[in-house]
């Protein structure tokens, strides 16, 4: 008996045709959509719940586990029903995946809603459905393909290429330009398009009556129409959810590659939120920014060159520019959308008193750490006004290496001042910043101020060189909050704000991020 050639052992009875190539191309689309839903869920959870590392890790873990379940469940789909079930599957993936971001945004605005439960339920459902896609496509191709090894290599190649495409497009184009809600609907439409194409191209192979094919086409049309309507209404849906979340009129809402910026207004109160977290209220921000800026500039009386890291709203700039001896201010903020908004929006420009139009100001849109590594400039005062250290990407800007790098750009007689969270609500976070500065070689003078929007808020003055500091008793510029008595009180801590034992924040442990999460979890639970 002759031995068959090796390829014959790996063959199926159907010949190769053009439909196979189109199915392989469909793999590219469904892989892109599958990863997109995972990224949308992770980004949305990070935006709404904070702690991006935890949220992305848990979302990815749950999603991959659900995909594994879906792959196992796919074995129960009968061979003669593969095409029909694939069409149904794509419609379900498109529907659940497409509406996921909009549904979660709207749900989060309802205080009593079980947001986390619904989030992980949606992730699980979408993951199971996505996990079934590739096994079904491979089985369809195997019934039509001559060589199984070639089939596997082609399917996985296009699977990985689709994942690569969306992993690049999502952070660079889709999320910042379309937003999470519209991006979700877009990929839902892609899944629906695959369902419609399969239904039309393989209509003769479905093994269904004309009536059943018509019913499937009707379902596809309904899903597509719903997703198109959602895509068209994405901005309105996002506006409704954010209006319900923040409670006030939204006058600006911008998605950048780095963050979501929302500015609200209620009567004369303007508020800025970054990723859902309050950054200032115009009713009391002067307290925060006077406390942040003025003690340092009063102490370094000859300060001519000032560095601002963060502070893209221009409110710290407004305080600095009160001093006529200041000749140059360099502001380094990562997000150009932030500095552009506060340079051009009429109400916000009025709030920062046209600070960005002052010829003494230079704006650099760059990562602060990378800029410090390449810049050669020296400064008399450095104002560090970063967001709170709620994740590792921001936590590195509060680390020992970062403060050592910053010290190279501060004159020997210069001072650094840092916003350092709340010594009352987040004592370990606050004193961790102080310990980190000392570990980096600074002498420190911690202080705090009451900002009604935030509560008791903390700052730390620090000297990398031989500069000394005494709380000022007078101010050379107009103030609304600070005077001699207020300043003296700021540098005194009440017994209910004791200093706990903490370790410095290093890059290899990021202890500050852990302290911050634990401190605020205890306050907000």
UniProtKB/Swiss-Prot annotation:
Keyword Transmembrane helix belongs to the record: yes
Gene Ontology CC annotations of this record: plasma membrane
Catalytic activity: S-adenosyl 3-(methylsulfanyl)propylamine + putrescine = S-methyl-5'-thioadenosine + spermidine + H(+)
CDD domains, A to Z: AdoMet_MTases
Record domain PABS: where: 220-464
GO terms classed as biological process: spermidine biosynthetic process
Matches recorded under PROSITE patterns: PABS_2
Catalytic residues identified in the record: 385 (proton acceptor)
Positions bound to S-methyl-5'-thioadenosine: 259, 333, 367-368
Pfam families: Spermine_synth
EC numbers: 2.5.1.16
Annotated spans, Spermidine synthase: 222-471
Enzyme class name: transferase
Transmembrane intervals: 21-41, 53-73, 89-109, 117-137, 155-175, 180-200
Binding locations of spermidine: 289, 313
Keywords tagged on the record: Cell membrane, Membrane, Plasmid, Polyamine biosynthesis, Spermidine biosynthesis, Transferase, Transmembrane, Transmembrane helix
Membrane disposition: Multi-pass membrane protein
Pathway assignment: Amine and polyamine biosynthesis; spermidine biosynthesis; spermidine from putrescine: step 1/1
Stretches assigned to coiled coil: none
Function: Catalyzes the irreversible transfer of a propylamine group from the amino donor S-adenosylmethioninamine (decarboxy-AdoMet) to putrescine (1,4-diaminobutane) to yield spermidine.
Entry-linked HAMAP family: Spermidine_synth
Stated family: Belongs to the spermidine/spermine synthase family.
PANTHER family associated with the record: THERMOSPERMINE SYNTHASE ACAULIS5 (PTHR43317:SF1)
Subunit structure, interactors included: Homodimer or homotetramer.
Name used for this protein in its record: Polyamine aminopropyltransferase 1
Gene expressing this chain: speE1
